[in-house]
Amino acid sequence: MEKYVVVLAAGKGTRMKSKLYKVLHQVCGKAMVEHVVDAARAVKPSKIVTIVGHGAEDVEKVLAGKSEFVMQEEQLGTGHAVMQAEGQLAALEGATLVVTGDTPLFTSETFEKLFAYHEEEGNAATVLTAEAPDPFGYGRIIRDDQGNVLRIVEQKDGKPEELKVKEINTGVFCFDNQDLWAALKQVGNDNSQGEYYLTDVLEILRKAGKKVGAYKMPDFSESLGVNDRIALAEATRIMQRRINEGHMRDGVTFIDPATAYIDADVEIGNDTVIEGGVTIKVHTVIGSDCLITSGSRIVDSQIGNGVTVTSSTIEESIMEDNTDIGPNSHLRPKSLIKRGAHLGNFVEVKKAEIGENTKVGHLTYVGDATLGKDINVGCGVIFSNFDGVKKFHTTVGDKSFIGAGSTLVSPINVADHAFIAADSTITKDVGKYEMAIARGRQVNKKDYWHKLPLSEDEEWK
C-alpha cells in the first residue's frame, strides 16, 4: 500500500497572540510542524503535502526538502484545506493520512499503527481516537453495537448520553485515497461557519456503504493540539519528559529530569551525568562519561568523551576528549578546545583554538588566537584583538608561559618555549626561548611615607 500524508498548516493561530506563525512556535528546539512532518517521514510515505497559508514562506523554509507545499489562499475549513492537494494526490492509489501541523506530540509509531489498522480492516476511512480523562470540548466518537463508527458528535451538538462518551476524535484521519477525493466533491458548506469540514467525509462514505472505522491509540497526550501559550507549555513539558526518558533508557543519568531542558535533536552518550538546571540545544552531540553541572548551557556544540562542564556556556564550539571548563566560563562560537585542555573560572574564549593540555586558569579572555599545546596562561591575561575597526589574530607556540596580568596586543606571534613576565603588555613578536618583559620599572622612594598627607594621622603611624 502506498502511503501519503497531508499536513494542515494554513491557520493563523490568533490565540497565540504572536507575530510568529502558529505552527512555527518551537517545542524542544523544533517547530511544531517540523515535529509532525518528521514523524510522518519516519513511516516512509511516497509523498508529503503541507497545506500552507499565513506565513507560507517561513513554513516552506523550515520544511525545505521534507515536503511539497500547496497554498490555501482562503481558509474555509479542514475539508477545503485538504481539497488544495487534489493536484498532487487525486490520481494516486493508496492511503492518505491527514494531520494538523499544531499537534507536535504524535509519534511515528502511532502513524504506522494507524496505517496498518486501516489496511487490515479494509476501511475507506479510519479515525484516530483516544480515551480522554476529560472529553469536554472534543468531538465524541459514536459507535453502534458492533463497534462500527456511526458519527462524530461535537460538544455543542451532543445529547446528554452522547456527551458521556470519553472516546474522542484526535483530528487525525486515514483515508483510501480514491474514496477521499470522491467524497470531498460532495462536501458542502451549509453550516453556521460556512466552511467545508473534513469530518463530513465520514458520513458521506458511510452512506455510500463504505466501511468507516476507528483506531484508538493508548496515549491520549499525543493528541494535544496547541492553540495558545498554555498548551504550548504543556506540549513542551510532555515532549521534554519523552526526550529525557529516551536518553535515560540509553544510559544517561539525569539528576533532576524535570529541570533538564534538552532539545529533540541532541545526542548524549552513555554514562554521562546531567544535573538539574541544564539546557542543551539544537544539534549538540555529547560523548560518554561526561559531567554537565547545574547552570550550564550548551548550544549546537560537539562535546567529546570524559568532558566536565561546570556551570558554563558553550556556543557553536568543540571540546575534545578529557577537557574541562568552568565554573562560570564562556565558549563563544568557533572555538576549539583540544584534548586534555583546562579552562578554569571566568574564562572567555572566542573564535580561538586552545591546544592539547594547555591550561587557562581564570579571569582570562582569549579571542581570535591559536594556542599550542602544554601552555600555561596565568590569571587575568587578555588577548587584545580589536583596534576599533578590525580583528587581529595572535599565535602562541607550544610549552610557552604567559604570566598573570599580561596583555597580548594582536597581531603577534609568540614562539615555542617563550616566557612572558607577569603584567607585561606585549606588542611585538617573542622568539623561541626568549623571555619578554614589558612593564614600567619599579621605583622604591625612601622615607616617602612622611610626605603623605596622612602622615600626621595617629592611625597611620
From Swiss-Prot:
InterPro entries, per the entry: Bifunctional_GlmU, GlmU-like, GlmU_C_LbH, Hexapep_transf_CS, MobA-like_NTP_Trfase, Nucleotide-diphossugar_trans, Trimer_LpxA-like_sf
Main location: cytoplasm
Annotated region (Linker), positions in chain: 230-250
PROSITE patterns: HEXAPEP_TRANSFERASES
Transmembrane region(s): none
Positions of UDP-N-acetyl-alpha-D-glucosamine binding: 8-11, 22, 72, 77-78, 139, 154, 169, 227, 332, 350, 365, 376
Localization in the cell: Cytoplasm
EC number(s) given by UniProt: 2.7.7.23, 2.3.1.157
Source domain of life: Bacteria
Protein's UniProt name: Bifunctional protein GlmU
Source organism (scientific name): Lactobacillus delbrueckii subsp. bulgaricus (strain ATCC 11842 / DSM 20081 / BCRC 10696 / JCM 1002 / NBRC 13953 / NCIMB 11778 / NCTC 12712 / WDCM 00102 / Lb 14)
Taxonomic lineage: Bacteria, Bacillati, Bacillota, Bacilli, Lactobacillales
